[in-house]
């Protein structure tokens, strides 16, 4: 809502992730920015971090990629309130809340930035009070699979593993701290 107002006023806009709750809304914002001749950016910067460039550089050393695993799971400080009926933006569908849009977007950006758009995508979520509190997104690429996990209802150490025929790359931090 605020992004649209700023674009209509002819302002350049940086939007926190996700850019919009749906592809259709994203296209509307992009078209508006083009018409107004202003810039519209999403604030996910993972692909521009120095260590991300290093991962890209090291990928050929592990041979043919076969499996990719990304896990960004952190017990939300707002989860208990959510369970008690206090729905804050992080758990509000109208605000693009939930595990997919709040956390898994970093995993997806990481994977798609390295390997491009997948052939198929499937999302299996744990739904609580109508919103995904955790879930697993699988991406099917020609020759390999990627699994992207995110949770707001439980925690685990961040772990990113890219497995190839000659080795693997392991990152022990979230994608946005690449």
Stretches found by the model and what they are:
Residues 22, 75-80, 156-158, 170-172:
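A short beta-to-alpha transition loop/helix N-cap that caps and shapes the active-site region
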Residues 16, 71, 163:
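Alpha/beta-hydrolase-fold catalytic nucleophile elbow
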Residues 107-177:
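Contiguous beta-strand/loop segments that form the cofactor/metal-binding neighborhood of enzyme cores
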Residues 1-47:
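Beta-strand-loop-alpha-helix segment that lines the small-molecule cofactor/substrate pocket
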Residues 46-119:
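Predominantly a Rossmann-like dinucleotide-binding segment in NAD(P)-dependent oxidoreductases
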Residues 3-8, 27-30, 54-58, 81-86, ...:
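Short, glycine/charged-enriched secondary-structure capping and boundary segments
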Residues 18, 44-47, 72, 127, ...:
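Structured beta->alpha junctions
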């Amino acid at each position: 809502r605020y992004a649209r107002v700023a674009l209509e006023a002819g302002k350049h806009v940086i939007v926190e992730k996700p850019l919009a709750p749906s592809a259709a809304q994203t296209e509307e914002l992009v078209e508006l920015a083009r018409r107004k001749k202003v810039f519209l950016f999403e604030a996910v910067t993972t692909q521009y971090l120095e260590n991300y460039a290093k991962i890209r550089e090291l990928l050929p050393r592990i041979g043919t990629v076969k499996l990719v695993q990304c896990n960004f799971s952190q017990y939300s400080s707002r989860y208990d309130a959510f369970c008690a009926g206090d729905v804050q933006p992080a758990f509000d569908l109208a605000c693009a809340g939930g595990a997919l849009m709040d956390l898994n977007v970093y995993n997806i950006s990481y994977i798609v930035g390295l390997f491009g758009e997948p052939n198929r995508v499937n999302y299996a979520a744990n739904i609580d009070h109508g919103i995904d509190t955790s879930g697993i997104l699988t991406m099917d690429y020609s020759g390999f699979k990627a699994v992207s996990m995110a949770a707001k209802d439980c925690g685990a150490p961040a772990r990113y593993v890219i497995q190839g025929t000659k080795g693997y790359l392991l990152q022990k931090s979230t994608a946005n701290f690449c």
